[in-house]
Swiss-Prot record:
BP terms from Gene Ontology: carbohydrate metabolic process; D-glycero-D-manno-heptose 7-phosphate biosynthetic process
Gene3D superfamilies (UniProt xref): Glucose-6-phosphate isomerase like protein, domain 1
CDD domains: SIS_GmhA
Quaternary structure note: Homotetramer.
NCBIfam families tied to this protein: gmhA (TIGR00441), PRK00414.1 (NF001628)
Ranges of residues in domain SIS: 37-192
Cofactor: how bound: Binds 1 zinc ion per subunit.
Gene Ontology terms, MF aspect: carbohydrate derivative binding; D-sedoheptulose 7-phosphate isomerase activity; zinc ion binding
Catalytic activity reported: 2 D-sedoheptulose 7-phosphate = D-glycero-alpha-D-manno-heptose 7-phosphate + D-glycero-beta-D-manno-heptose 7-phosphate
Organism: Escherichia coli O7:K1 (strain IAI39 / ExPEC)
InterPro entries reported for this sequence: GmhA/DiaA, Phosphoheptose_Isoase, SIS_dom, SIS_dom_sf, SIS_GmhA/DiaA_subfam
Identification of the protein by name: Phosphoheptose isomerase
Length: 192
């Protein structure tokens, strides 16, 4: 009954991944991001991650797998997803939704830390403000974006962009794969 729809969805996902893989810059950016994150951890730094909606879930998933574990047991790594409901509701109410991530970065970010900002469109105003706050703190910035990178294009030390212009879920599917690869590479870098 829905077999054609299922095949079409899986084929589109495979095509999106194939297009992402065609650009060697993406592979190099993932490797550079993993090394940057591991170097931050080795130097006593941490990663703060943020995003909205599904990207927020990806930010939490990234932090959880760093503080917990991925595939193998190992020490936890310092990662915080900006997801505290009381913080988000307080800042959202008192300052505005666009400030929910930047206020947190201002409060706990420091030089040597890394911000991972995730936005499928690259146009999330609150993530863009978090990037600006991270820069003011002397932090490094990694972004996961989609489409043409939106307003976030060119704002990061390392941008990993999924050049897909359809629905956001295809971009999110690549983002979560990139997140898993980053964790795998970080684990390898941490034991060097």
């Amino acid at each position: 009954m829905y077999q054609d729809l299922i095949r079409n969805e899986l084929n589109e996902a495979a095509e999106t991944l194939a297009n992402f893989l065609k650009d060697d810059a993406n592979i190099h950016a993932i490797q550079r991001a993993a090394v940057l994150l591991a170097d931050s951890f080795k130097g006593g730094g941490k990663v703060l991650s943020c995003g909205n909606g599904g990207s927020h879930c990806d930010a939490m998933h990234f932090a959880e797998e760093l503080t917990g574990r991925y595939r193998e047991n190992r020490p936890g790594y310092p990662a915080i997803a900006i997801s505290d409901v009381s913080h988000i509701s307080c800042v959202g109410n008192d300052f505005g939704f666009n400030d929910i991530f930047s206020r947190y970065v201002e409060a706990v970010g420091r030089e040597g830390d890394v911000l991972l900002g995730i936005s499928t469109s690259g146009n999330s105003a609150n993530v863009i403000k978090a990037i600006a706050a991270a820069r003011e703190k002397g932090m490094k910035v990694i972004t996961l974006t989609g489409k043409d990178g939106g307003k976030m294009a060119g704002t990061a030390d390392i941008e990993i962009r999924v050049p897909h212009f359809g629905y956001a879920d295809r971009i999110q599917e690549i983002h979560i794969k990139v997140i898993h690869i980053l964790i795998q590479l970080i684990e390898k870098e941490m034991v060097k």
